[in-house]
């Protein structure tokens, strides 16, 4: 297994819309290894979710584990939200936008259809942090970042803060 490099804003590859995955690809050894590497990368970061587009793989899947013990891994392949309910503000962060946190309003509960890592169709109802994380990671698959929900002024402040952080690292 190997850690994968995580793309960071403003990298234009984060804006690429991910392609659907053929069911036959899901069970291939190469795809299974990619899933394992994404979990390894997410846990190492540390994070609670990682979309394939964040590691420069433009396919519609993501890995998530919101448990404290990191023992409830979920793989969502070709996810599709089929129902939403309520609205709630959560403070979000992102491995591709390091050190930045902002309040984002999302559906409080969702129902999502997807393929699991074995290529089996699944449907899950999710609430709270898991629902927020699924919606956040699905945005990545459509080339959208949580900072896109911010006003243009706040988004520009984020861009400047990240540029300043990069200067200090270099």
Swiss-Prot record:
Fe cation binds at residues 94, 136, 140. Removes the formyl group from the N-terminal Met of newly synthesized proteins. Requires at least a dipeptide for an efficient rate of reaction. N-terminal L-methionine is a prerequisite for activity but the enzyme has broad specificity at other positions. The active site is at residue 137. This is Peptide deformylase. The keyword rRNA-binding does not apply. Its cofactor is Fe(2+). Keywords: Hydrolase, Iron, Metal-binding, Protein biosynthesis. Binds 1 Fe(2+) ion. GO terms for biological process: co-translational protein modification; translation. The keyword Protein biosynthesis applies. Its EC number is 3.5.1.88. It is an enzyme of class 3 (hydrolase). Belongs to the polypeptide deformylase family. It comes from the Bacteria. GO terms for molecular function: metal ion binding; peptide deformylase activity. It catalyses: N-terminal N-formyl-L-methionyl-[peptide] + H2O = N-terminal L-methionyl-[peptide] + formate.
């Amino acid at each position: 297994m190997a850690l994968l490099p995580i793309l960071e804003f403003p990298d234009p590859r984060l804006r690429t819309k991910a392609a659907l995955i053929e069911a036959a690809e899901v069970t291939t050894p190469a795809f299974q290894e990619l899933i394992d590497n994404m979990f390894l990368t997410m846990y190492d970061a540390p994070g609670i979710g990682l979309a394939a587009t964040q590691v420069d793989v433009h396919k519609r899947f993501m890995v998530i584990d919101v448990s404290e013990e990191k023992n409830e891994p979920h793989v969502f392949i070709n996810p599709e939200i089929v129902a939403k309910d309520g609205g709630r503000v959560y403070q979000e962060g992102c491995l591709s936008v390091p050190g930045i946190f902002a309040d984002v309003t999302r559906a409080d509960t969702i129902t999502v259809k997807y393929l699991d890592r074995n290529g089996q169709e699944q449907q899950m109802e999710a609430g709270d942090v898991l629902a927020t994380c699924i919606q956040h990671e699905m945005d990545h698959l459509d080339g959208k970042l949580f900072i896109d929900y911010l006003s243009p002024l706040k988004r520009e402040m984020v861009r400047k803060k990240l540029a300043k952080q990069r200067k200090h690292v270099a």
